[in-house]
Amino acid sequence: MAFLKKSLFLVLFLGLVSLSMCEEEKRENEVEEEQEDDEQSELRRSLWSSIKDMAAAAGRAALNAVNGIVNPGEQ
């Protein structure tokens, strides 16, 4: 009976150690994913900012071109 008790405790202990290691690895993976998400968000923000700046510059250029056509001598 004592042998079975020791074996059962050993199995439970090893199971807890294994579970603990899996939980730690899972937390590490979640942290890595959060860092990747943050990097992707920063990249998207900078991309949208660049697109917005280019669109504004194109709009100003188009407005200047239209003003040049409509009012050719007033620049």
Curated annotation (Swiss-Prot):
Q: Extract the signal peptide range.
A: 1-22
Cellular component per GO, a single term: extracellular region
Give the function comment from the record: Antimicrobial peptide with activity against Gram-positive and Gram-negative bacteria and fungi. Has been tested against E.coli (MIC=47.50-128 uM), S.aureus (MIC=189.98-512 uM), K.pneumoniae (MIC>189.98 uM) and C.albicans (MIC>189.98 uM). Probably acts by disturbing membrane functions with its alpha-helical amphipathic structure. May penetrate bacterial membranes, but stay at the mammalian membrane surface. Shows a very weak hemolytic activity.
Name assigned to this protein: Dermaseptin-SP3
Q: Enumerate the InterPro entries for this protein.
A: Dermaseptin_dom, Frog_antimicrobial_propeptide, FSAP
Q: In which tissues is it expressed?
A: Expressed by the skin glands.
The alphabetized UniProt keywords are: Amidation, Amphibian defense peptide, Antibiotic, Antimicrobial, Cleavage on pair of basic residues, Cytolysis, Fungicide, Hemolysis, Immunity, Innate immunity, Membrane, Secreted, Signal, Target cell membrane, Target membrane
The record's similarity note reads:
Belongs to the frog skin active peptide (FSAP) family. Dermaseptin subfamily.
Q: Which residues carry this modification: Proline amide?
A: 72
Q: Where in the cell is it found?
A: Secreted; Target cell membrane
Cleaved propeptide residues: 23-45, 74-75
Domain of life of the organism encoding this protein: Eukaryota
Annotated GO biological processes are:
defense response to bacterium; defense response to fungus; innate immune response; killing of cells of another organism
Which species? Answer: Agalychnis spurrelli (Gliding leaf frog)
